[in-house]
């Protein structure tokens, strides 16, 4: 195989890898959104627990919005 042919094959492999990667990223957007919702729920529960703890509340009043 000549150098030109090897370079062409290399470019085709890179192009194919890029296309597969791009299309698989687009398909995972819904799954990523669901994971972010779960993470925000976990953070909310953690903050609520902190707001009921007086020392933690004192350090994080901005997050507790004045509620205990």
Curated annotation (Swiss-Prot):
Organs and tissues of expression: Expressed by the venom duct.
Disulfide feature: 50-56, 51-64
Source domain of life: Eukaryota
Prosegment residue ranges: 22-48
Pfam families: Toxin_8
GO cellular component terms, A-Z: extracellular region; host cell postsynaptic membrane
Keyword Secreted included in the entry's annotation: yes
Localization of this protein: Secreted
Keywords linked to the UniProt accession: Acetylcholine receptor inhibiting toxin, Amidation, Disulfide bond, Ion channel impairing toxin, Neurotoxin, Postsynaptic neurotoxin, Secreted, Signal, Toxin
Modified residues (Asparagine amide): 65
Family under the similarity heading: Belongs to the conotoxin A superfamily.
Domain notes: The cysteine framework is I (CC-C-C). Alpha4/7 pattern.
Official protein name in the record: Alpha-conotoxin-like Mr1.2
Organism: Conus marmoreus (Marble cone)
């Amino acid at each position: 195989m000549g150098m030109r042919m090897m370079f062409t094959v290399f470019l085709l492999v890179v192009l194919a890898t890029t296309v597969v990667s791009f299309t698989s990223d687009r398909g995972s957007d819904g799954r990523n959104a669901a994971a972010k919702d779960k993470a925000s729920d976990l953070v909310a529960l953690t903050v609520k627990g902190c707001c009921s703890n007086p020392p933690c509340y004192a350090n994080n009043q901005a997050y507790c919005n004045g509620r205990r």
